[in-house]
């Protein structure tokens, strides 16, 4: 374990939003740690690899939840001060580990007079159980332990301030866990050296990013080319067909239940039971009748039609 202090990579106040996004791509931050460990619900290691290797554009876009989370950060931090009696200050910089310059930290707040940090969160009321009693989501525990690891061994504690559903506030604290920090950094070092610098892609997953990657990389085909698949693909194909069959059966069961509920609703647009609401409302949809357009206005159809190319995947049993 190093006793050196974290270094300032860049000051947030001296960077534009675009520059800040580019700097984040140059290393592994706290929110990346849970992705690498497979604990993140929203992003996979493969998607992170695409981002860190520059294979997807640096994205400025953020979800509405993330937008309001950023907007409310000051309010959450001030409420923490009121409830805890502690004082906090901003650390307006991207920090980096003194030995591993690709391990970065962008800490929300530092605790004044204490070797500790504050992480501010906003979350939906649906996630209330994740914060009940002593509970803290694993991905956030990993995030702050990553930060404590970057800051150095003298930083012994992290606090969370959380606004839940816009009307419930909780704050919690956790101690530094050196064993967990070592495990996190080991995984991050391996990911950066082997995957990012070494160009070795993580295992493909079911994300839309992985699908787009394959579409772009293998957009062109060799006409009628056929290959012998490796032995491992026999089991993959069998599992694929089984899952597709299960999906079809489940969709049929779901449709049956849906029809039974609709039958009871009759001409009502809404139905209520307990804390559930069923909705069956009329929807107006305007679409172009392409067949009619082609028949009656062939010249216009030729001008506006768009030809697309894609590869269709399918599996069938052959003799």
UniProtKB/Swiss-Prot annotation:
Report the protein name in the record. Uncharacterized protein YqaJ
Q: Which organism is it from?
A: Bacillus subtilis (strain 168)
Domain of life, source organism: Bacteria
Pfam families, alphabetized: YqaJ
